[in-house]
Amino acid sequence: MPKLKTSKAIAKRFKVSSSGKFLRHKASKSHLLQKKSSKQRRHLSSTCSVDLKDIKNIAMQLPYL
């Protein structure tokens, strides 16, 4: 059976925590930031866990993590 390939696009966007959860960065933090408040920018900088509905799809694309 051939080796499973890791999706590099997904590997760059998601990390696995020590407890096994998938972590992601929040969106809307790349440009058009001057209209956003400091509080909003600060909260967008934090990481959050992936929704339960998406975990199966991400795990299939990252077979060795």
From Swiss-Prot:
Predominant localisation class: plastid
Superkingdom of origin organism: Eukaryota
Stretch forming the signal peptide: none
Biased composition (Basic residues): 25-44
InterPro entries reported for this sequence: Ribosomal_bL35, Ribosomal_bL35-like, Ribosomal_bL35_CS, Ribosomal_bL35_sf
BP GO terms, sorted: translation
Subcellular location: Plastid, Chloroplast
GO cellular component labels: chloroplast; large ribosomal subunit
Keyword entries, A-Z: Chloroplast, Plastid, Ribonucleoprotein, Ribosomal protein
Coiled-coil ranges per UniProt: none
Region named Disordered: 25-45
A UniProt-annotated Pfam family: Ribosomal_L35p
Gene Ontology molecular functions: structural constituent of ribosome
UniProt keyword Membrane, yes or no: no
Family from the record: Belongs to the bacterial ribosomal protein bL35 family.
The name this protein goes by in its record: Large ribosomal subunit protein bL35c
Lineage: Eukaryota, Rhodophyta, Bangiophyceae, Bangiales, Bangiaceae
